[in-house]
């Protein structure tokens, strides 16, 4: 019901109802049967008229009848017939009176004024609606910045973990706002702007909120997209209004989230030099450069895309200081987990540092989601504390999504998936530079039918050519296992091939790791599709070089593929034995996998109650019947195994 009162239909309904009552007030309808002039003449001739009032204004005759007693009627008459009417009344000896211009003045005034008053009232109502808030029509030129209330819950630097360098830089901002004379005495000038940049989920907005909670000065928060509208000049007007508010409340802080929405490199796109976004950027440049030292206004901005920002925005005098907020290392992840587990009941055996080691590449948002998922799982099962089981399942949910235990797979597809995943695991296990295998499963998660997770033992910032080669070989281990065991390949390796081809292309064209082509970069980096500085780029190499690049990419991929096949051919017995165990057990953990590879039996690894898997001989590929072709999976998804890729996170092969 509240939605109806706020909708546009409500004022329209009010106007219709008021107009109806006004019409009824001005022209009230008669009740009873119609009384016409001929009926009046009949009553007059029969002597049934008791009295009459002749109203010259409106040409109406008010008649009072004898029977029914004192019943009154109004009837119109022709003005030219007035004298004749009066004569008839005199002849019939009817008492009558004549009313001239006398009338109800208030009613006449209301007749003319009421419609106008209704229109004025409706117009005022509309104006109040469109001017009521920052998002209304008549407020286009006003800034949409939200001022942080003093009474709102505060976030301090104590709530920020894993970004010590960024906290140190921003802590200096707080000190300047609290005690500017300390810096001015040494002739220091505080940075007018601080740009926070880094991957999504690393805590850039959280840092800005912490500054707001610590500084104790007015804090204005706005998004870059709030400046851009379809109307010309709105963005520039909002920028001016924002800085006017800031100057009136100095010292203060302005925080602009996702500044790349308005600060993109000028000249990009199809808008030309008079693009509305560019006019907004020009006004922002003028306002930032127009600061005076006494204003004590500091602007903090956050973005995931510093590479597309206009150089004029990043020059000294505007954003003097640029702070990188990167993914936390193991120590940082441990501190972040301590923050997010604060106040949550954890089991005694949980080791936060060990948990941080299991989450390489996780951002602060990922870790917060991990802990929340674990808490939800514990509550779902009726536990009173969060155990290691829920935390490990939370890691898997963040990486690959929830389990799909109800997904129905045929026995043939399940067998192919198991051998595919075991191919990844065995190749990764026997290669020196591949990341250790952490978990293997044929239980689907998300859109994948199975997965193999490999985790680095420590955070890595550089990768060698040998490590890239081993990683590609491990990625192709699933396809190699299908070829060796089944003599056939499936669509499950489609994403494997995509990842391997991309890595080989980077090695040749970006990293200079091709012995034939040498240390040289070819072409432009296409990994940033939103740069927008150029719609198309031309290759800076000849067709002959392009052919050599293709040959090198093919050679690198085939080398990795052959390496995977050689390893699996040598360890074919382990591939068959452990894959059959995986089909039966569905999931094999790291320690169990390593024990099985070392030659231990299933009973020794899983317990005495386990029986060895049945020895089911695999028929040659030429003797197996072919099933009816099935629809191909969507591009990039696994057809027979999990081929999910999360950059900077544990590898799923």
From Swiss-Prot:
One GO MF term attached to the UniProt entry: ATP binding
Chain segments carrying region Disordered: 603-653
Any one annotated GO CC term: plasma membrane
Alphabetical list of PROSITE patterns matching this protein: AAA
Cellular localisation: Cell membrane
Cytoplasmic side: 1-7, 127-653
Coiled coil spans: none
Pro residues bias (residue ranges): 611-620
Keyword annotations of the record: ATP-binding, Cell membrane, Hydrolase, Membrane, Metal-binding, Metalloprotease, Nucleotide-binding, Protease, Transmembrane, Transmembrane helix, Zinc
Major site of localization recorded for this protein: membrane
CDD domains in UniProt: RecA-like_FtsH
GO biological process: protein catabolic process; proteolysis
Stated role: Acts as a processive, ATP-dependent zinc metallopeptidase for both cytoplasmic and membrane proteins. Plays a role in the quality control of integral membrane proteins.
Cofactor: record remark: Binds 1 zinc ion per subunit.
Binding site for Zn(2+): 420, 424, 496
EC numbers: 3.4.24.-
Residue ranges annotated as Extracellular topological domain: 29-105
Transmembrane segments: 8-28, 106-126
Bilayer disposition of the protein: Multi-pass membrane protein
NCBIfam families: FtsH_fam
Cofactor(s) this protein requires: Zn(2+)
Family designation: In the central section; belongs to the AAA ATPase family. In the C-terminal section; belongs to the peptidase M41 family.
Organism: Conexibacter woesei (strain DSM 14684 / CCUG 47730 / CIP 108061 / JCM 11494 / NBRC 100937 / ID131577)
Active site: 421
InterPro entries named in the record: AAA+_ATPase, AAA_lid_3, ATPase_AAA_core, ATPase_AAA_CS, FtsH, P-loop_NTPase, Pept_M41_FtsH_extracell, Peptidase_M41
Protein name: ATP-dependent zinc metalloprotease FtsH 1
């Amino acid at each position: 019901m509240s939605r109806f009162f706020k909708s546009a239909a409500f004022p329209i309904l009010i106007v219709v109802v008021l107009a109806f009552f006004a019409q009824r007030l001005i022209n009230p309808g008669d009740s009873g049967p119609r009384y016409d002039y001929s009926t009046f003449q009949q009553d007059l001739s029969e002597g049934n008229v008791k009295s009459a009032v002749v109203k010259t204004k409106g040409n109406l005759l008010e008649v009072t009848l004898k029977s029914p007693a004192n019943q009154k009627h109004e009837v119109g008459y022709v003005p030219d017939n007035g004298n004749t009417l009066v004569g008839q009344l005199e002849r019939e000896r009817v008492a009558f009176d004549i009313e001239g211009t006398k009338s109800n003045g208030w009613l006449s005034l209301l007749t003319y004024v009421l419609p106008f008053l209704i229109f004025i009232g409706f117009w005022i109502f509309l104006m109040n609606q469109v001017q009521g808030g920052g998002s209304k029509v008549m407020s286009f030129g006003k800034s949409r910045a939200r001022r942080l209330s003093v009474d709102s819950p505060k976030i301090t630097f104590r709530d920020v973990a894993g970004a010590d360098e960024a906290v140190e830089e921003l802590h200096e901002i707080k000190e300047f706002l609290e005690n500017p004379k300390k810096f001015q005495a040494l002739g220091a000038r505080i940075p007018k702007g601080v740009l926070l940049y880094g991957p999504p989920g690393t805590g850039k907005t959280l840092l800005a909120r912490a500054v707001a909670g610590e500084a104790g000065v007015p804090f204005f928060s706005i998004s870059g997209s709030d400046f851009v509208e379809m109307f010309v000049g709105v963005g520039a007007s909002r920028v001016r209004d924002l800085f006017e508010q800031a100057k009136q409340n100095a010292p203060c802080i302005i925080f602009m989230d996702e500044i790349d929405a308005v600060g993109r490199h000028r000249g990009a796109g199809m808008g030309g030099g008079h693009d509305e976004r560019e006019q907004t950027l020009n006004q922002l440049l003028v306002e930032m450069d127009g600061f005076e030292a006494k204003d004590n206004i500091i602007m903090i901005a956050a973005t995931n895309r510093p590479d597309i920002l206009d150089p004029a925005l990043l020059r000294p005098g505007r954003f003097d200081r640029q702070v990188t907020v990167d993914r936390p290392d193991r120590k940082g992840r441990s501190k972040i987990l301590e923050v997010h587990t604060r106040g949550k009941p954890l089991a005694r055996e949980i080791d936060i540092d060990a948990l941080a080691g299991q989450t390489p590449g996780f951002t602060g948002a990922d870790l917060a989601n991990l802990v929340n998922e674990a808490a939800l799982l514990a509550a779902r099962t009726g536990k009173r504390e969060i155990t290691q089981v829920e935390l490990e399942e939370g890691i898997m949910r963040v990486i690959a999504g929830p389990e799909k235990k109800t997904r129905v797979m045929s026995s043939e597809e399940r067998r192919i998936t198991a051998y595919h995943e075991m191919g990844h695991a065995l190749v990764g296990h026997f290669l020196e530079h591949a990341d250790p295998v952490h978990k293997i499963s044929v239980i689907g998660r998300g859109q994948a039918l199975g997965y193999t997770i490999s985790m680095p033992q420590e955070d890595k910032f550089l990768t060698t050519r040998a490590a890239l080669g081993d990683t590609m070989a491990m990625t192709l281990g699933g396809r190699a296992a299908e070829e060796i065991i089944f003599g056939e390949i499936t669509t499950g390796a489609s994403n494997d091939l995509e990842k391997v081809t991309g890595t080989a292309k980077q090695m040749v064209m970006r990293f200079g790791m091709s012995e034939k082509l040498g240390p040289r970069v070819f072409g432009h980096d296409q990994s940033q599709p939103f740069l927008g500085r150029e719609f198309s780029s031309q290759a800076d190499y000849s067709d002959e070089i392009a052919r050599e690049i293709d040959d090198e990419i093919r050679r690198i991929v085939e080398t990795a593929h052959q390496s995977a096949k050689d390893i699996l051919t040598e360890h074919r017995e382990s591939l068959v034995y452990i894959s059959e165990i995986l089909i039966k057990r569905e999931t094999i953990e790291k320690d169990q996998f390593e024990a099985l590879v070392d030659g231990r039996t299933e009973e020794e690894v899983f317990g005495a109650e386990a029986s060895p898997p049945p020895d089911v001989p695999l028929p040659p590929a030429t003797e197996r019947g072919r099933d009816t072709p099935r629809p191909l999976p969507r591009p990039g998804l696994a057809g027979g195994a999990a081929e999910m890729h999360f950059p900077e996170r544990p590898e799923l092969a």
